Amino acid sequence: RVERALSTAGVDLRVSTAVETVRRGTLGVEVKAVGGEYEAFDDVIFATHSDITLALLGDGNSIECEALEAIKYQPNEMILHGDTSIMPKRKAAWASWVYTEDKERQSDRIDLTYWINRLQSLPNDDPCFVTLNTQRDIDPALIYDQCTFHHPVFDVAALKAQKVLTDLNGANSTWFCGAWMRNGFHEDGLATGIE
């Protein structure tokens, strides 16, 4: 439905098109897809992680580059599962987000479980959880998926960089958006895209 609406509005939507580099000039922006030629556009909207944006921005100025480099990422190991043993023993203590810390943990990253049923209003008879960075055992029969996410680290440098990049939005036909431009939530990505 969205693709049809964009097509009706004259939008040339290109999905799964890897971009090699972006350069800006007095007449707008040129984007070069992998294996393609440069194509001209009025503006560019970077809706990618800041490190990917930096890699794509072939002619970034020092202010843009310093701000984009200031936002660091950390890997978080994700397990999508249905193992209720990972949650507190008392069901009354279950919450949308459950933080656990083992005195003997071997990592500097937090062990956090999202209760997907509560967050997505799913029926509770089929428990679904996303657990990050756990060193606890999860029943392998109840693991549905595993992957590594790269989440932004919101330190002082990152917060300053967010402000710099927000102030730069629109300059040089360039726009920056994404969850990393606020608090890291999907809704933040949408909000910064709309802004």
What does each of the following model-derived ranges do?
Residues 2-3, 31-33, 188:
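Structured catalytic cores of enzymes that bind and process phosphorylated ligands/cofactors
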Residues 6-20:
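A conserved beta-strand/loop element that lines the FAD pocket in flavoprotein oxidoreductases
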